[in-house]
Amino acid sequence: MEEERSNERFVLLAIMFSLVFAVIIVQLVNLQIINGKENDENSQQRLVQDREIVASRGIIADTNGIPIATNRVGYTVQIAKTGLKTPEVNEMIIKLIKIFESNGDSYESGLFDYLTFNPIAYGKRINNSDKALEKWKTDIVNKEADVKLLNTPEDVFKYFRDKKFEIDKKYTDEEAYKIMCIRYDMLIKGYTASNPLRIAKDVDTKTVAQIEERSHEFPGVLIDMEPQRRYVEASDFAHVLGYIGLLSEEEYAAKKSSGYKLNEKIGKMGIEKAAENYLRGINGKKRVEVDTSGRLTAELDSEPAIPGNDVYLTINSRLQKVAMESLQRNIEEIKSKADYKKNFGDANSGAVVAMDVNNGEILAMASYPTYDPAVYLAGADDKEAEKKKEEYRNDDKNTPMVNRAVQGVYTPGSIYKPITAIAALEEGVITPDTEYYDRGYDTIGGMKFYCLEYRNHQGPHYKEKLTEALATSCNMYFHDFGVKTGIDKIDKWAKLFGLGEPTGIELGEAKGIRANKETKKAKRNDDWRPADTAQSAIGQFDNGFTPVQLANYVSILANGGKKYTPHLIKQVKKYDGSIVMEAKPEYETIPVKKETIAAIREGMVAVSNSAEGTAATTFKDFPFTVAAKTGTPETGNEAKGSSSNALFIAYAPANDPKIAVAVVVEHGVWGNNTAPIARDVLKEYFGLNSNTYTDDQIAIEEVKFTH
């Protein structure tokens, strides 16, 4: 009986096992034979991703539409998150970097600014700030207690290698640092399967080919195309153009609400910064299907990117190049004539601003020394570019990154004398025919002042009227009538003409400073004295103005009292050609009499057209009349072996003004040393380099004086 029951159980179990096995066989047949192909395809897991289409930045062009900043297409390398383990990610990164390096490509990383290698040290963003260093260390640690372990850069390096990124001992320290660079960006900027991280831009086609050929080694690595910024004739336009760069953490915090991402680029200086809202495009999107390795299998749909707006400047490219070339050439020439008495061979920098007197358009804006903005487009691991940037940053003597045209503040010297004359004329202190007898010296407020020619043993100017005083730049004339006019009235007119006041130009500008009672009290905590007025009246003492203010000032002299807002942006257009913005000339009318302007014009014409004029040599045989003024302000360091600065202002044609020019050369020795620079600019503007000029460019007879 028991044996029969046992046999029954055995048969039952056998039947059950047979049924289970049969089910398995049926399923296998179904999976592998009947639906094998379909199931094989489904086994390749598919992901749907939303990928960004990067919009091209708007171009920047000159007034004639000649591009200065444009774009080209370049390949980028991105990493999307996959299921790779940490050791596999690290190995993949080092393989990618080796490909980059073999083809001369650079890769991106924010770590360069915080931790460097060879030597291992803190980067430029934290090496001079204990507060920034502590904040950074707190942000990067896994546990708060770990901060106490990070006392040196070497500690941070070890922490990153061993704890944070678990980098295998088989890698050298240099290889480990390279892995850290990419892993750091993965950590800080974040990346997911649907939001890949860009690790390299504008890579060589060889890099693209090698990555694609070995795609099985690089799961999640994507190749895409993005517009890359390109600068044309970059050094000539550097200070106007500026450059773009990756968002800093501070910029990102301020801009993320506007849709910016941490790995985006933004205008950092110049028009790139000033016109950021115009130039930035709107990124598009595409929905794609990818396999588990991140390879694209299908593009489902897309929303195209909208390019940024194109910005057209008031700058004329040819005029800009002439201004830059002439500025550099004349600085070298001044330097070469060192006599180590007055000229100490230290001329090294300067600026030129040319302005349309009838609408405020800036026609040229040159600042020297210049820099190459293209180096700021390179990757952070581009050693040559980083070296160049470091040179620019550390050049405290020449400061090439400073736009002297809007940020340089210079004592004006004698180019200020027309303002003193305007104040004296408008306030009824003098007429154009009021005579001053220059005996070579005078005592004002207990201080003795000398005529420059008298001091140089050439004899004083004797009797002079306004025209002669401007032509010969007689200090004694302006000392005397400046004191009689008074500092308050002189300062009032200087302010009306925009000196020591922001001009409103699009670029970041210095305000400058005017010599007056308030300024002296604030700077020196001292009362004003008559001798202070005497010095201020000839453009010395606390007076300090930017070249763009000086160009604006001479423009007002030229057009008879219209103070325009200087501007660099002429027009903004959409990619389809429709106009987004068009500059409309704005001006304030200065309440100055026509007779006053005429008297100043006569004196400034005499500067360039009389035998005794301080710029007569430069404009001898010039085919039309130029109204001008030279300035040789003292810096206070002449006794220490430093040359005086040199300044020059002009407008032309004097009888029908079109253009105003202001020139500054630091340590340029004499004001008339800068006149050839203005002459070159005027020649180019009026087409004289091709020996063509129009009927309104008519020469006048030489002005002659009688004493």
Regions of interest found by a model, annotated:
Residues 1-305, 329-351, 357, 370:
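Membrane-proximal periplasmic segments of bacterial cell-envelope enzymes
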Residues 67-69, 75, 289-304, 315, ...:
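Beta-lactam-recognizing serine transpeptidase/beta-lactamase-like catalytic domain environment
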Residues 75, 87-94, 98, 205, ...:
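Solvent-exposed, polar/charged alpha-helical surfaces in well-ordered, non-transmembrane soluble domains
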Residues 87-88, 232, 374, 478-479, ...:
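Extracytoplasmic/secreted cell-surface and envelope-processing proteins
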Residues 99, 329, 333, 426-428, ...:
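Active-site catalytic microenvironments for nucleophilic, acid-base chemistry
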Residues 104-114, 222-227, 334-353, 433-435, ...:
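Surface-exposed patches in mature extracellular/periplasmic domains of secreted proteins
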Residues 306, 665-668:
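Ligand-site clamp/hinge motif
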Residues 578-585, 679-707:
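Short, gly/Ser/Thr-rich active-site loops of penicillin-recognizing serine hydrolases
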